Amino acid sequence: QMCIRDSRYSDDYTSAYYYPDLSSSIKNATLAITAVENQLEAATTTAHEKEFFPNVKQFARIWRAYLISEFVDNFGPYPIESFLGENPVFNSEKDDYEFILKELKEAAAAINTSVLPVEAEGKCDPFDNVKYDPVKWQKYANSLRMRLAMRLSNIDKATAQAEFEDAAKGNKILTADDMFAVKENDGWDVFSGVYTRSFDDQVLSSTVANLLTNLGGIKVTEQRSDLASYVKPANYLGIKYDRHYVANTDNPTKQYWLDGMPENLDPRALKIFCLPDDENAENYIDKYNDRTAKDFVLYTVDENGNPIPNKDNPGEIKIDATRCWNGYPAGSRGGWSPTLAYNQLVTNGYGPGCTLPMLGKDYCKGKSRIFFAAWETYFLLAEASLYGWNTGTTAKEAYENGIKASFEYFGVSEYVNDYLNSTNYNRVGTSVKFDHTTEPVSYTHLT
């Protein structure tokens, strides 16, 4: 996960995704398919509509195939004959995937790419950068088919390979212009941005903090020279607070607080996340104007977790989180762990949002959200090439093109060549260079 909605545990989102979200969306997509068939028989249908509406049917089939894949992957068997006026029978997941892949193949082939929508029709596309462009929808169908075929690679490799190779022959999402993005609005309508709620901090997780640190070997000061005074040596882990953070986690940086910035960061990191109180950053947002990164403390406790000198008047360890790079420790909540009870950085309602990096302005106040990106297609091609499948490219070429596409999107292409040749390991032992296969060794960080 890239970030987490800190300190809150609920299955309400999962329940709502099952019903009404997915169920209603599949129903509406099915209705669109049948409505086209009825509309084509209407006497009022124009010559243009008789050409355009069949494409709409294919767009709806593609969209429904995606929705059904979401249902199957999240909840299990799905009834293929749903929303057709009769009580359906649930199909097996194998049958569901066969249906999904067949729908995508047939729909992509049936799109008439010479038929373009008029302006009013294009505005109806929820992917506002696509506007019912038939070629782009065809590319989405093929890239989506590649994604879903790859999911079968561990259970039905023959089917996965056949479906993938066939889809890879067609048009695919490979450029920034091809990518699908959903428009986002402020407010409370169906297009409200998923990260726009002021009560959602969307802070950096410890997992992603470890992944991005040192990956690519690009110095933070190359991007932001004004952060030089906050940068710590690459082998410095931070200050250990083993009385304030839990130990029962596999996080390699558990119980450490980095009082500054790591020397090297993936150059996309500071485009995605903004640092606490980093008002110089282009993507900075201040959700809590009356609080700062210096307003939260750790209360002093003894080796048994008892406050010092007493519960009513514990001492304080002042923390200045200004422009510091730390991730929220997954599984943390003060009510579940007495270790965290005296840690305001975690348990105070405003603590995480003020002391940890969070998704920046482009996410919280953006106008669109990427739904299917070019780099995913490239990484799918890279994985398939490693399996020896026919892809028309090599694993290395596709892998590097995927990274280049991502760097282009985030506006950091000037770093991509050095990044691609980096053999630096991040905190979980991963390096960027494709040909760098030397396994990392354990070493001790300075603290």
Residue ranges and their predicted role:
Residues M2-S7, T444-T447:
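Conserved small/polar residues in nucleotide/adenosyl-binding loops
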Residues R5-L380, A384-N401, A405:
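Structured, solvent-exposed acidic/aromatic patches
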Residues Y350-G351, R369-Y378, L386-W389, K404-F410, ...:
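C-terminal functional modules
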